[in-house]
């Protein structure tokens, strides 16, 4: 974080003890990842935890979809410790608070999701509550949460209250709408209970695949915590960021916007790739905070003609991608400019223009290509997520190439082919491993490909499920047919 003296000041937070690796306070910003192995496969989980730790991951999260998986965390932890690795393990819990109770016995931290901890899973139904009825719902949450906090207190287990935009409850959505205020209140309800019962070993996160929603919501959360005299440390991440260059840029735009403002105590770069590949990217973001805070400040001072201009001196392409996205992200998200120019000797102008376009798209300023929202996968994913993403991207690219060839061979059909591909620019396709955030993220996507059962997929258009339980080997073709059916009407 060098080269940023005078431009970067970190938000004050209290220390949360996660095993032997504390976060918050004056501790370094921690980097972490999550396994994508089946939690009942102890050997595979141990091996992947060790790979993540060897890459530099400081916490490793595993999905615990049931009590059986939570119980198996004991064996996974034993295997990791026998290998001489002390990395803290985190259980990821949705839908069943009993699972969190069990996981707290064996893990250094447990993540719970306010959207489905006590509230029913999201059904996109509008619910009417009187103030008294709403207060009664909060009492139900408190009655269930307090015994869990007591277990955590007795076993020195930390808690992450992790809100996902894609899994807000119908209760929250009905009262606050699909807004940053609703996302923040979903978190604050739980934090107030923790404060009331003097349980402070809590880290919090607010994540979304939409970088604008994520940044605005985290900023609002920080403001609300300050009003209520809370100093909980923050975990940052852009959920379902994708893979490859797009995933890295989107993560750098969202996470970097906040890091350069001094917000964030631990980060995860969620990529639809092998989880150990997330760690070097996360480390680069942390190491670049000071420099990017300076670049952001200088770029803001020289905005002209609605354009952010960045001047960098990188020799490594990935470092250039990440630093440019970090430095420009907040300026674009906040609407201070709507164009971006990047200067960096050693890379040709065409490549730099494409990078600028990708950053503009990640900041949701200008859409020049199809956007893919894809989760990193976890033990809940029952199909080949990474391979599917490649096949869907390839299918879209084949269609674009086919129409481009027609235009080249038959110039008279140029306007026809432009019209035929116009819908692919800015089209949002969500490729989700399971039902936790899948249906919720459909609200921000045009089409969705969501894991249903082992080897089976459901296809969505917006919030509506169009086809259920399609065999995996047929699903990509069916998705393309669905897009063709609706987009060419």
Where are the predicted features?
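N-terminal small/glycine-rich loop or linker at the start of catalytic domains
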Residues: 13-37, 73-74, 157-176, 310
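Conserved, mostly hydrophobic/aromatic
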Residues: 31, 92, 161, 204, ...
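Glycine-rich phosphate-binding active-site loops on the catalytic face of alpha/beta enzymes
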Residues: 58-61, 107-123, 261-276, 336-349, ...
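Catalytic alpha/beta core domains of metabolic enzymes, predominantly
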Residues: 128-141, 173-410, 428-430
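Alpha-helix-loop-beta-strand connector modules within alpha/beta enzyme cores
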Residues: 68-91, 140-156, 221-230, 392-396
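N-terminal amphipathic alpha-helix/helix-capping segment at the start of soluble metabolic enzymes
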Residues: 1-33, 149, 153-155, 291-305, ...
């Amino acid at each position: 974080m060098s080269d940023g003296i005078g431009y970067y000041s970190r938000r004050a937070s209290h220390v949360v003890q996660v095993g032997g690796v504390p976060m918050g306070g004056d501790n370094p910003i921690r980097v972490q990842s999550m396994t994508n192995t089946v939690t009942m496969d102890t050997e595979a989980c141990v091996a992947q935890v060790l790979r993540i730790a060897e890459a530099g991951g400081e916490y490793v999260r595993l999905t615990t979809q049931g009590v059986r998986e939570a119980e198996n965390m004991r064996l996974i932890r034993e295997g990791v410790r026998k290998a001489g690795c002390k990395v803290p393990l985190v259980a990821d819990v949705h839908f069943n608070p009993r699972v969190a109770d069990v996981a707290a016995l064996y893990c250094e931290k447990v993540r719970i999701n306010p959207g489905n901890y006590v509230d029913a899973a999201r059904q996109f139904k509008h619910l009417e509550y009187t103030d008294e009825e709403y207060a009664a719902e909060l009492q139900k949450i408190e009655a269930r949460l307090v015994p869990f906090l007591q277990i955590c207190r007795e076993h020195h287990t930390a808690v992450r209250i992790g809100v996902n935009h894609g899994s807000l409850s119908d209760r929250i959505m009905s009262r606050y709408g699909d807004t940053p205020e609703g996302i923040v209140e979903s978190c604050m309800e739980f934090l107030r209970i923790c404060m009331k019962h003097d349980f402070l070993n809590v880290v919090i996160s607010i994540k979304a695949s939409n970088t604008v929603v994520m940044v605005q919501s985290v900023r609002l959360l920080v403001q609300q915590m300050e009003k209520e005299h809370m100093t909980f440390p923050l975990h940052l991440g852009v959920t379902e960021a994708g893979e490859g260059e797009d995933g890295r840029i989107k993560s750098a735009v969202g996470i970097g916007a906040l890091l350069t403002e001094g917000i964030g105590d631990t980060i995860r770069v969620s990529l639809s790739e092998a989880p150990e590949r997330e760690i070097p990217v996360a480390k680069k973001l942390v190491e670049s905070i000071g420099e990017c805070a300076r670049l952001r400040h200088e770029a803001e001072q020289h905005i002209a003609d609605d354009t952010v201009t960045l001047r960098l001196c990188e020799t490594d392409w990935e470092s250039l991608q990440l630093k440019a996205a970090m430095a420009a992200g907040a300026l674009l998200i906040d609407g201070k400019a709507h164009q971006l120019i990047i200067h960096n000797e050693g890379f040709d102008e065409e490549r730099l223009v494409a990078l600028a376009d990708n950053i503009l798209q990640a900041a949701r300023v200008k859409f020049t290509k199809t956007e893919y929202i894809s989760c990193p996968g976890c033990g809940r994913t029952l199909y080949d997520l990474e391979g599917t993403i490649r096949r869907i991207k390839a299918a879209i690219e084949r269609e674009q190439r086919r129409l481009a060839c027609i235009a080249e061979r038959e110039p008279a059909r140029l306007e026809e082919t432009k019209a035929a591909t116009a819908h692919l620019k800015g089209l949002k396709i969500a490729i989700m491993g399971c039902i936790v955030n899948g249906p919720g993220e459909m609200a921000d996507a045009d089409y969705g490909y969501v894991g249903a059962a082992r080897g089976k997929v459901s296809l969505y258009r917006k919030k509506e499920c169009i086809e259920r339980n399609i065999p995996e080997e047929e699903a990509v073709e069916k998705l393309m047919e669905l897009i063709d059916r609706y987009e060419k009407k």
